[in-house]
């Protein structure tokens, strides 16, 4: 199994290192981590759709080269934080059928990911907290790519997590997405860390939160049959 991690930074800053601890710990369990580079508005003259499509292109490349990389194409998960979470959702969710003309004519995407994992991901582009992203788009384009408008049956399992004291991206939207996921007969789990803030998933900020989240995510993935249980998952990181 493997995970394709899309970093956060709200498409302004580069946060490539955020998921390195995750990739390193998962590697010890036999799970490969991939952290792609993509253009951001902070460094390039790109539009939101350019960035979202680069996420899909990364997914298509990894899936198409799975054999070369030694990966099982049926067990590749997509994950991300804030805007990277939006990219992961854009990979997993089908295009809004009424808005097909907004999307470029690209080669068909490969089959969807095995699962989606969000670490305080952007779920609703109409929310004030997501204005830095949704405000960059024309209203019709924003509505077409808004994850909450694209949830339907037949989606991969979703693991969504958030800090209860996140003042930048309130946790209610993550909970709402997980509930809507289940309402459409898909499997999901929402993990709320009550007293954690926006930085809750960073290993170098709070190792205890990191371990709690890693254990919960691992258990969920084992339940879905995507990851295989091994004793190292229960060993703990803090001793």
Where are these regions (language model features)?
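Catalytic nucleophile-loop/oxyanion-hole region of alpha/beta-hydrolase
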Residues: 15-22, 34-73, 206-210
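Short beta-strand element of the alpha/beta-hydrolase
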Residues: 1-9
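Short alpha-helix in the alpha/beta-hydrolase fold that links the catalytic acid
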Residues: 147, 156, 170-180
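Acidic catalytic loop of the alpha/beta-hydrolase fold
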Residues: 125, 165-169
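Primarily recognizes the serine-hydrolase "nucleophile elbow" in alpha/beta-hydrolase
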Residues: 57-132, 142-143
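C-terminal catalytic histidine-bearing segment of alpha/beta-hydrolase fold enzymes
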Residues: 175-178, 182-239
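A fold-wide structural signal in alpha/beta-hydrolase
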Residues: 2, 27-37
């Amino acid at each position: 199994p493997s995970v394709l991690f899309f970093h956060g930074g709200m498409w302004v800053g580069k946060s490539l290192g955020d998921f390195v601890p995750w990739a390193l710990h998962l590697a010890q369990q036999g799970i490969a981590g991939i952290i792609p580079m993509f253009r951001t508005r902070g460094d390039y003259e790109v539009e939101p759709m350019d960035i979202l499509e680069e996420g899909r292109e990364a997914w298509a490349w990894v899936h198409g080269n799975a054999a070369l990389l030694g990966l099982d194409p049926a067990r590749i998960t997509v994950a991300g934080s804030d805007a990277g979470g939006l990219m992961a959702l854009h990979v997993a969710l089908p295009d809004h059928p009424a808005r097909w003309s907004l999307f470029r004519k690209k080669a068909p995407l490969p089959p969807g990911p095995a699962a989606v994992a969000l670490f305080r991901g952007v779920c609703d582009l109409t929310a004030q907290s997501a204005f830095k992203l949704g405000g960059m788009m024309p209203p019709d384009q924003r509505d077409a790519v808004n994850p909450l408008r694209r949830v339907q049956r037949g989606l991969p399992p979703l693991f969504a997590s958030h800090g209860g004291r996140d003042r930048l991206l309130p946790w209610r939207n993550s909970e709402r997405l997980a509930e809507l996921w289940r309402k459409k007969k898909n499997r999901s789990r929402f993990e709320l860390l009550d007293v954690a803030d926006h930085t809750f998933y960073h290993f170098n900020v709070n190792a205890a939160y990191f371990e709690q989240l890693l254990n919960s995510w691992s258990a969920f993935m084992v339940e879905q049959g995507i990851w295989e249980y091994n004793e190292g998952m229960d060993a703990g990181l803090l001793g």
